[in-house]
Amino acid sequence: MAVSSRTTVGRMRTSLLLLALASALTACSGGGGGGGGGGVDAVEKSTTDHAEVAVPVAVRALEADEVKASGQWQSCMALSWRYEVFASMTAPEGDTATQLEAVKSALVDDGWTDDTQVDDHVTLTREDATVDVAPSPARGPGAWTVKVQSSCADYDGDAKDRVENDEARTIELDR
């Protein structure tokens, strides 16, 4: 059976296309190395470091107290993982829009980039972290939450076991 040059070219194109697709997928996934360019420990430290800066800024802007914070790995759409520091606090009741603007201004002054896209909370970014601040009336009068999150990433092996079985731990934040 003779193979025409058209068939050979078609197979070569298909092979090249598959190689290009495999390369693109590997580049996008980061090779399983973790979010923010690091492993589990580096991502936890970076996110916690960002929280140690952002949460006190929000606390001061809101004149809040009763701050509690914890850190834990969270699933991103059941496909990958991100590390999150979650803080709750109580602030004097006031005009929510004014309070949100005060928080946003304070964080922007501290070097965060405003990335807010919806009402009733503020979202800012810095390097590989996102901070989101919002009132939380379901928690009681004057309740607010601050989430500081790493970007989502895939992990494998021991790192995957660690993030899948992580339990929340208290984080002490200076105010």
State the predicted function of each range:
Residues 13-17, 59-66, 135-143:
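Short, intrinsically disordered, charge-biased short linear motifs at domain edges
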Residues 29-33:
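Bacterial signal peptide processing site
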Residues 90-97:
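Short, surface-exposed ligand-recognition loops at beta-strand->loop->(often short) alpha-helix junctions
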Residues 99-163:
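Extracytosolic low-complexity repeat regions of secreted or lipid-anchored proteins
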